[in-house]
Amino acid sequence: MGDSFVSRKYRIISSAVEIISESGLSALTTKNLALKENMSETLLYKYFGGIDEVLVEVVETYSKFDKGIRQTVQAKETSNVEKIMEYLEAYATYYDNYYAISTLMLQYEELLHIMETREKIAWCITERLVFLEQLFQNAMDSGEISDLFSASFLANNVTGMAMSHILERRIFYHKKSFKEEYMDNVRKWMGLLRIEK
């Protein structure tokens, strides 16, 4: 495959992400995607067999940095709390730099109902939560944070906080970046969990 084929395919995926961000998952049709890409629907089929194939690639794009982020955080020689913060900051940075992709977090339910994306998005959600749970459990085991709440509860809370910030930003204008706002709230929240030594 030539470079132009790959780059055009990537532009189509980027346009699909933009359509989802601007108008929701239901607006992602071959017609809308072809219009946005200024191409015919027939030409679109040269790159993808249909919208479901595009959606699979969108989900792949959404989760493509997950493994690298986990490996980088695990390799750090730092406290468990710092690992949690670095993990969350990596996603906050990603969502700041590619804001349209963050809206996929608000589409989880719908993506779970589409047969072609169900397995991949379920895997992505589960892997992120399991990794966060482990980070929180390690922080509890080392006495860095309180064990008043379960690691699973904390992982779900911090994920819910991200979803809430993403949703709120779609409704209201914010002067601060997503990363600034989210990480500021995470720091305050983590301060409540920390055990002073």
Outline where the language-model segments fall.
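Generic hydrophobic, amphipathic alpha-helix propensity
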Residues: 8-17, 33, 58-62, 66, ...
